Curated annotation (Swiss-Prot):
It is found in: Nucleus, Nucleolus. The lineage of its organism: Eukaryota, Metazoa, Chordata, Craniata, Vertebrata. This is Unhealthy ribosome biogenesis protein 2 homolog. GO terms for cellular component: aggresome; midbody; nucleolus. Essential for hematopietic stem cell development through the regulation of p53/TP53 pathway. It comes from the Eukaryota. Its main location: nucleus. GO terms for biological process: regulation of signal transduction by p53 class mediator; ribosome biogenesis.
Amino acid sequence: MAAVYSGISLKLKSKTTSWEDKLKLAHFAWISHQCFLPNKEQVLLDWARQSLVAFYKKKLELKEDIVERLWIYIDNILHSRKLQNLLKNGKTINLQISLVKIINERVAEFSLSGSQRNICAVLRCCQGILSTPALAVIYTAKQELMVALLSQLCWSACRQPEGAVVAQLFEVIHLALGHYLLILQQQVNPRRAFGDVTAHLLQPCLVLRHLLSGGTWTQAGQGQLRQVLSRDIRSQIEAMFRGGIFQPELLSSYKEGLLDQQQGDVKTGAMKNLLAPMDTVLNRLVDAGYCAASLHTSVVANSVALLYKLFLDSYFKEGNQLLCFQVLPRLFGCLKISHLQEEQSKALSTSDWTTELLVVEQLLNSVANNNIYNIAADRIRHEEAQFRFYRHVAELLINHAQAPIPAWFRCLKTLISLNHLILEPDLDDLLASAWIDAEVTEFRTKKAQEALIRTVFQTYAKLRQVPRLFEEVLGVICRPAAEALRQPVLASGPSTVLSACLLELPPSQILDTWSLVLEKFQSLVLPYLQSDADMALKSLSLSLLLHCIMFNMRSLDSSTPLPIVRRTQCMMERMMRELVQPLLALLPDTPGPEPELWLQKVSDSVLLLSYTWAQVDAMFSLNCSQYHSMSGPLIGVALEISNLPSLLPGVKTQHWKKIEKFTAQFSSLGTYCLEQLYLQKMKRTLMQTSFRSEGAIQSLRCDAAFIIGSGRKSLNQRTTASWDGQVGMVSGLTYPVAHWHLIVSNLTILISYLCPDDVGYLASVLLRTLPMGKAQEVSIDEEAYITLEKISKAFLHSPLFPEMQSLHSAFLTCVTTSCSSILCSGAQRDSGLVSQQLPWLFEKDHMVVGHWENRFAKAGPEGIEPRGEIAQNLLSLVKSDFPIQLEGEQLESILGLLEVISALQLDSLLPPYHVHYFLVLLSMAVTKLGCSCSSSLALKFLTTCYQLLGYLQKGKSARSVFKIMYGSDIFEVVLTSLFRASSRFLIEMDDPAWLEFLQVIGTFLEELMQMLIQMKLSLVLNFRKITAFLSSSKPYTEAASSKQLENQNPQGRQLLLVSLTRLCHVLGPFLKEQKLGQEAPAALSELLQQVVLQTGAVLQLCSVPGARGWRLPSVLISSVSTLLEADLGQHCRDGGADISQGSDRTLLSHVALYQGVYSQILLELPALAGHDQSFQAALQFLTLFFLAPELHPKKDSVFTSMFHSVRRVLADPEIPVQVTQDIEPHLGALFTQMLEVGTTEDLRLVMQCILQGLDVSNMWKADVQAVVSAVTLLRLLLNCPLSGEKASLLWRACPQIVTALTLLNREASQEQPVSLTVVGPVLDVLAALLRQGEEAIGNPHHVSLAFSILLTVPLDHLKPLEYGSVFPRLHNVLFSILQCHPKVMLKAIPSFLNSFNRLVFSVMREGRQKDKGSIDDLPTVLKCARLVERMYSHIAARAEEFAVFSPFMVAQYVLEVQKVTLYPAVKSLLQEGIYLILDLCIEPDVQFLRASLQPGMRDIFKELYNDYLKYHKAKHEGEKRYTA
């Protein structure tokens, strides 16, 4: 046989054997164990290699598929486990260079032509060689082969191939780069490495890195590149450049090329044969032929930033700053923008500008972050070489302004941060192009502009040259320009920045700046305002600057130096006399039909200045007694009517009237400022002692009326504009928002002086401007903006709103009027008839509706019911044909209004409003709904109505409703309406919307009946009427007549069921309580018995199974639970023979029903786990069923059946962990009842199942759910109060349980990743077991097993959520041992501290300051650190036991804390804990630590101990003085 197989070698070499047969023979020889060829692996590999080499050298002709199969054959050998095992066992397999060369040739062919012929197989072979160290040596030994391969691979990738080849290609590139990096590390000839990288690898790798950075292959899709691999390859390329181009050995060459040329002193160094490395790199970089023209600009730009970063990483250190700078101009010269001349901005596209400016930003940031630019050193030693370069960059940026690009602003910001003198010569152009004349609209660009302006102002504030800066700003503003095209000078960003800067300035600089603006205004603008629109716009810009300066200066006060006060007072007087009054004089006495633009802007300007002056004047007068206002004293003066405060001093009232008429022609900034002036006047009036005089009150009313009336027209336009809150941004478009904001912000002042018409108008505006539809998506930059909707919504939810009684009442009226108008619009009859039938819809005065209670009330003592005319009227309308029908659009409108009503405090309404709202809401709820209303919309509407009725009836005035309507009549009206409406609902019974609706209806009806009981309102009468109504209702009569189920209304049946159930739920407990106090009325007991029978009949009808797969409806489960509770309650309560027999018969008559539901619930319990209410109701039923032995089936044990059903719930893998945790308390209540009533044998069954589940073999079988369910059952069991034989049975099993938990935890912790679904519950139940104390676990060995569990649980490499879940559980176990096992702790303190130290060190590791990443995980670490601090306090409380170990605990802490830099909050908590341990250390312990700690640790301990003495011990010593 061996002879046959040995002939294979000859057949492979034979020319007569077909290639098909050769390949089959070769494959067979490789896989067969009976083929005894000498050195078989080498022979077969050489045969395939020789065949391919012969083919590619044209010595052999082969078909294409044969070539492909030969490559695949080599690939199979290279990737086979057999070959790997042979190599691992030391066998040598030689790859010939000829194979490697043809691989390189094929890759080169692919890179040049893009031909993918055989390329996948070739790449697989290459990957097989490179991934096997024993084979890869052929590449690593021949560096030129690796360089050639890597170069061609990168060029291949640069062609941007697609399809399956992508992943394979980049896998090989990743491997090749890894090997080449190892070669570079071992390279002893830096010149060779530099030459290889720059000549062969620099260009393709730069292009490849650019493409990878742009995400060319990382989009989702088949054959695409993984992001992790992309990031790794980019990192490898950077490492290759660092190791090849920027080697430490080349530093002298870089110095020769960069520094010596500059100094004219050419020196020869050790590397003199290597010519200018920087020139070599840059020439290769800017060469135009290595990539497409469309890519060249961006490749060069991105590469410039990379090369400079790598240069700094390699060579930057103290003393090399000049060298690192000299590279910068050379690299900057590679960018296109460096060669731009004047007026050549358009030579580059926007995308090119963006790319290159981003690179310039990176370069400048590198300079700033590494402190390369030292101003003094540059000036003294280097003749301002750096300064001149930065000036060149600054001129380039200023001359080619690119305001739409955020990076342009950031570059300028960095330049001014380096040295303000860089931009000082172009300061005016900078301010013009970056601020005054810049057109900035995009959010990111606004933020960049804001940061630049902030830096400019902060810089000049530090230099105390803000007046100089403002001189430049004023110069730019006053330049001739098309002002209408300019953006507002103080939009939100610049205004915020300027305000923050001005607040920090000393008063003298503020006053200098103020004076400067005033002078410029007077000299350059004021004389030329007449009929000049541009000048008028300039005046507005200067007014805004003045407003910002005056509003953001520090207020004068009693501590302000007198010269500053006097100068400020002079400035105020000068401004009024020389600026405000002349500007006011420019406004016409008689306004024309349409005011000119210049007049509008002048009026805006002067009114802004007037408002500013008045506001600042009032502030100075209030805060500084040395300031004497031109307006006279502000407070404490009793004024005559003729001397009431004016708007401005020196301006007559008649002149203001003319100004009012003029500004009334247009809504703009001037109108807003005039309103502010009137508001300021009101405040001044209120500060007088005579503000309550008739004249003062009349003046206040007139002023308030003016403020409200001036914007009435604009508010009616319903604008959707948004306002940033800055005065300068008030315009015709944003004025309504600013006006409404002014009113709402000052309503506390205005509301007392408004007439009823104005109050009603404000209420209507508030309602009209509230958002009633879906919230629209808002862009990031508009989030902080103010809109009408935001203002109104905030005011509606404000606690001040209900306090403004007049406005609140008017708003309530508006809402009911709007609701009533929509309802009346759906009237199907004559409006006169409807007004007679539903008069409250047409009554706008709540008081009239509220007084109906007097009209309908009986004469008699409190508690006697009134007549029910309203209810009877409503009932007749509901039964016959309700006169109102709403369609879809009307319903949507009403839903919006209901949303508004839900925001009101319905529980605090006064009786008149309460009654009116109740009637309106009830009318809505019983209204007919048209065909255009979908079932979902109708359900949403009804649910909302009854929710609001429920909220209303929880209020303080709920009793007032029962003065005009019987409770039973309300019940009947509601259900009659709902029974009729339910027939049109095309909706599934288990639809969440329907179930929510049933819940809301049930809650409303139950609260209604509870209120009847609380108020003791004719209980027998009301409940008899309710019971009679339900028994005569259509759904009940249909059910009783046993008609065909499909012809009946299932929704109506469920409504009836909910009503009966809630009736049982109310009457049952009430009668039970009555039994305790006094004899329960027999009539109510009879009614309850009747209701129970009715409920049982309906339930039996509803519980008839339908089609296959039928499930219990959730409503039925809760209803049957209530029925059983009522049945059992009657059974236990009734003492009389007759009633007792009747209740027995009732209970027995429902046995089949209860048993059927019981069986169905046991089957469905796992499915119900995801529905909280249904699951609770099911468990409640099972609890009640378990407590009624007469209902138990005779065949099976109820305990066993229920227990196995609960086990199925816990063991169901489809139930999420969170759901299991949520239902655990409910299961615990059932379990407690079961074990309390159950026998010892029942408990033994439970214990047996728990121990089976805790068997470690379940982990080996990967049956995690069985383990988790057993642990959960054990936790439930431990929470049950057991005694006697049951308790001893549990404690006897504790050792076995602890051992099982130890094994389970060990298995779960060894899995990768750690099985936290097992570890977490195991720790929980272990803590619960340990908390039972030494009576339960008496053997110290079993407690010590807990320490082994704690040490086994891994705390490394956990996600933040996982860490936050595991850590507290570990802490709980430790705490349980410390608190509950004092005897064990006497000998186990080292084990305890070992486990505790793990927790401390893990907190240090997680709480260290990381180089990158957010601090989102910090709250989790802080919680864990607090637990550590608490444990330290518990240890310190046991001083006698732990005193000996305290120095070792401190030493461990110091040892670990020196390894990390902690977040301050984490460090503070840990230090507070270790201070408590230091309290236990005596002086010899401290001396021991100082002597034994290593030097580095000694310093940390010294600092720690000093802080301890300073902050902790001193504080506690101080406290002891006051301790008795």
